[in-house]
Amino acid sequence: MKGRDKLLETIEGIPLLRRQTEAALASGCPVMVALPVSGPRHTALEGLEVTLTTVRDAAEGMGATLRTAALLAARHAPDRPMMILLPDVPGIGPFDIKTILNRFEAEGGDTVVRATDDAGRPGTPLIVPPRLMESFTRLTGDDGGRSALKGENVTKVKIANSRATTDLDTPEEWAAWRSAQGIPD
């Protein structure tokens, strides 16, 4: 990102992290956000009713973030599922989140439910039943949860186009995405 923080990139004046957190809040579920130490990302969430937790070992990778989130979720709501919504996928909105939640409930609440793109590639969000929380608390390194999901039957929910998998990592990708969405820079 050439020194820029992709989670603070704006869409119609709103930082991506705040926008995705607001989408999660629109689901009506409690929202917990795991972030590295205080800074601009925390500031972007000011005024939102979320539980923030600090990922002290964020340099370790995605495993540390998911582990921290799972520990917090297990402590606050041990009998509730955990939805993982990666904030750097800007195409996901409240409707998509509700779609995943509704499918999880329809499946009986004990199956992993995960968004995919039109090609079937796994994306975000995904929701995991409480019985998997302990597996997530043991994640390490840059494991995005693959080891915790190993052997699980995953119900896939297609989210139109590539909204569930579009991860923008460069200023050029951001510019192209904004242009395709009709959103000014």
What are these regions (language model features)?
Residues 119-120, 131-132, 162:
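Short acidic/polar capping segments at secondary-structure boundaries
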